[in-house]
C-alpha cells in the first residue's frame, strides 16, 4: 500500500480517533471527527465487530497513516525493531520517532507530520548545519535540527511554533523557539510517546 494522499479527516472518522493529521484544525477543535465522531458514508455510524486479524491490520494502518510511511518503509522499520534487543513493539515506536520528519514535527516547527515532511524534502531543514532532505533520515541523540536561515520567517513555521506553544514540547528534545533549532537529546521512553497505537498488535501481525 502506497502512502495515503487523500482526504485525511475521513481517515480519522473511519478509525474514530485523532491521528494528528490536521494540526491547526485539531488544536482549534474544528476537526470533522469532533463534529461527526463516526465513520464516513451512509453506514458510518454502524461499527461492526472486528476480527483479531482485522484489529491487527487496523493498528498497522493507523501507525502508517499517522507517521506517513509506506508499507515498504514500515516493514523495514519493523525488521530493524525485531533485530534489536528488547521489546520489539517498543523498539518500533522508538525507531519511528527518530525519523527526521517526525522530529521536526515533535520540535514544533510543523503542525503536522505531513507539513514537516514537506519542510524536509524542500530543503528547509538542517542537521548539524548540513541540509538533509530525506524524511526517513534517522536522528541520533545529540544532533541539532534547525530551520534553515532563509526559511526561519516562513509564515507556516512561525504559525506552527505559536500553536505548538499551547501544547508543549515532548521531553526528549530541547528547543529554542526564537532561534528555531532543537536538540534531539535522547531516545524517548515508550510511556512518554502518547499515540493511539497498540504496537503489540502490529508485532503479532508481522510475526504470523
UniProtKB/Swiss-Prot annotation:
UniProt keyword Transmembrane helix, yes or no: no
CDD domains documented for this protein: S4 (cd00165)
InterPro entries: Ribosomal_uS4, Ribosomal_uS4_bac-type, Ribosomal_uS4_CS, Ribosomal_uS4_N, S4_RNA-bd, S4_RNA-bd_sf
GO molecular function per UniProt: rRNA binding; structural constituent of ribosome
Key words of the record: Ribonucleoprotein, Ribosomal protein, RNA-binding, rRNA-binding
Transmembrane helix recorded as keyword: no
Recorded superkingdom: Bacteria
SUPFAM superfamilies in UniProt: Alpha-L RNA-binding motif
GO BP, one annotated term: translation
GO CC, alphabetical: small ribosomal subunit
SMART domains given in the database record: Ribosomal_S4, S4
Domain called S4 RNA-binding: residue spans: 98-161
Family: Belongs to the universal ribosomal protein uS4 family.
HAMAP family, alphabetized: Ribosomal_uS4_B
Function: One of the primary rRNA binding proteins, it binds directly to 16S rRNA where it nucleates assembly of the body of the 30S subunit. With S5 and S12 plays an important role in translational accuracy.
Assembly description: Part of the 30S ribosomal subunit. Contacts protein S5. The interaction surface between S4 and S5 is involved in control of translational fidelity.
Name this protein carries in UniProt: Small ribosomal subunit protein uS4
